[in-house]
Curated annotation (Swiss-Prot):
UniProt xrefs under InterPro entries: Aminoacid_DH-like_N_sf, NAD(P)-bd_dom_sf, THF_DH/CycHdrlase, THF_DH/CycHdrlase_cat_dom, THF_DH/CycHdrlase_CS, THF_DH/CycHdrlase_NAD-bd_dom
Native species: Listeria monocytogenes serovar 1/2a (strain ATCC BAA-679 / EGD-e)
Matches recorded under HAMAP family: THF_DHG_CYH
Gene: folD
GO biological process, one term: L-histidine biosynthetic process
Name this protein carries in UniProt: Bifunctional protein FolD
Length: 284
């Protein structure tokens, strides 16, 4: 029976550490600031942004929310981002995705100053991650590495399989595992004999967006299984990309959904914002 990796508990520990560090900085008259830009009225995005704001404030950071209408022009959005780039009280900038179709996400991400890009999506940060240089790492992949390390497992020398090749999770988490000296395979919808490939993994990260996709025949006994999915099953109940009840028997460690990867994402955003502030102050 697999041991449950408690993402809530780990996220709380990391957030407490960030909060303590912010309190020390505030005593010196320095307060890290995070600005979130929300375009339109997507309810899921709105809920997510509210959570980010709440957690930012709990950590003692300055929190700014800029709301723009669905029909805002690309030019206007880019000028808002440029103003935030210049704002000395803001150290992290996040434009909530997805954006309306008439706006180029790529252009917006490229406009965010890479030293304030706490989402880790700017090409400079992506490039730094791939050459192993210190950079802002996308929040979910950064959280996944912390979850794996929390099991006490040494990543070096392990076989890792990542199912999913998105730019937001799959590719960066594969690169982070490689940077930790794991032997990494990226699998995806075109991979032949996927269960066999997955079964070789000491560490299996699943980010397919398909409810309960991974069954126990994908699992090497004792493997660490990280489920990035956030899906609904046939009864409309929240579940992951891994069939938890089936897989928990085989796994050594497994993240639940909810309560696994999810709580880590906002926590790593706060850690990135603190890192950005410290870097900017050091440069100045």
């Amino acid at each position: 029976m697999g041991e449950i990796i408690d993402g809530k508990k780990l996220a709380k520990e990391i957030q407490e550490k960030v909060t303590r560090e912010v309190a020390e900085l505030v005593k010196e008259g320095k307060q890290p600031g995070l600005a979130v830009v929300l375009v339109g009225d997507n309810q899921a995005s709105r809920t997510y942004v509210r959570n980010k704001q709440k957690r930012t404030e709990e950590a003692g950071m300055k929190s700014v929310l800029i709301e723009l209408p669905e029909n805002v022009t690309e030019e206007k959005l880019l000028s808002v981002v440029e103003e935030l780039n210049e704002d000395k009280t803001i150290h992290g900038i996040l434009v909530q995705l997805p954006l309306p179709e008439h706006i180029s996400e790529e252009k917006v991400i490229d406009t965010i100053s890479f030293d304030k890009d706490v989402d880790g999506f700017h090409p400079v940060n992506v490039g730094n991650l791939f050459i192993g240089k210190d950079s802002f790492v996308p929040c979910t992949p950064a959280g996944i590495i912390e979850l794996i390390k929390s099991t006490g497992t040494q990543i070096e020398g392990k076989r890792a399989v990542v199912i999913g090749r998105s730019n937001i999770v799959g590719k960066p988490v594969a690169q982070l595992l490689l940077n930790e000296n794991a032997t990494v395979t990226i699998a995806h919808s075109r991979t032949k004999d996927l269960p066999q490939v997955a079964k070789e993994a000491d560490i299996l990260v699943v980010a397919t967006g398909l409810a309960k996709f991974v069954k126990k025949d994908y699992i090497k006994p004792g493997a660490i299984v990280i489920d990035v999915g956030m899906d609904r099953d046939e009864n409309n109940k929240l579940c992951g990309d891994v069939d938890f009840d089936d897989v928990v028997q085989e796994a050594g460690f497994i993240t639940p959904v909810p309560g696994g990867v999810g709580p880590m994402t906002i926590t790593m955003l706060l850690a990135n914002t603190l890192k950005a502030a410290k870097r900017i102050w050091k440069m100045n």
